[in-house]
């Protein structure tokens, strides 16, 4: 009996010793040879690690490189100089990633990790990139027109919209991001049935990046795919006075809107929903025959007043293949009047853009 107990104890000690030796070997390999442990492929998933070091950092240098344009930063990718013990190309790449939202992960053979540098009053993250990878990164940036992260594409389109135009290729890239595809998954085809993908993109761009990425973060994309989450997202855009959000709520969630929305939110849906849409007309008919029909009567009185103005100032949603010349010819309105009414400084249009059409002169 004592022999068996002693044998079991020896086996436990042996297994523990082997485990500790393997751990020390991995740490030795990583520290002495400065290699990444996940290169050994011992783990099923990516091992993202950050290291931290205290160094001297000049705030003037950091401020100067932070204000550099993307073209200036990319030009530094060929620079072989060192600043504060680090290649200046690494400093430039860190700014390109953090400030200009450049995405280089498609050309990397391993997950992107960072080293945190701590100065007396500042902190800085430098990417752990092998200097041999910079030619590949340069080729990638030259060959791709929009090598940005999802947020970078969002901010770029947001800037274009403010200028009155959007590049369709950039819009296509944004609509292919995991965040936007998650939003479309939540809608279960409602965006296509009731409107268009371009109109949906226009809505989320107009309401800002903070709201969009709050709802479409990585945690939500993996665990929050439900009707409740869809209603929560659309309700948020409804609070932004978005007509499309009101319409999308009526495609799959009209029962929730009719029976569970408070009076204030229901009135908002009625006020914002496009009157000409079959979904709106069907919902309004159901509302008139429901216990909440008094809201239909109140909203009808409020909607009638703007319709007089609509006859004078019509709106048109740009479709695929439209041009200013075709729209002007279709509605019998001079092109210069449309340009003046919408404050355009060019003739480029993208699907989903809403044009205000001036009243026809008799």
UniProtKB/Swiss-Prot annotation:
The organism's place on the tree of life at top rank: Bacteria
InterPro entries cross-referenced by the UniProt entry: LysM_dom, LysM_dom_sf
Pfam families tied to this protein: LysM
Residues covered by the LysM domain: 314-357
Record membrane topology: Single-pass membrane protein
Keyword Transferase: no
Record GO cellular component, one term: membrane
Predominant cellular place of this UniProt entry's protein: membrane
SMART domains cross-referenced by the UniProt entry: LysM (SM00257)
Compartments, as annotated in UniProt: Membrane
Family indicated by similarity: Belongs to the chlamydial CPn_0593/CT_474/TC_0759 family.
Entry protein name: Uncharacterized protein CPn_0593/CP_0155/CPj0593/CpB0616
Organism: Chlamydia pneumoniae (Chlamydophila pneumoniae)
High-level lineage: Bacteria, Pseudomonadati, Chlamydiota, Chlamydiia, Chlamydiales
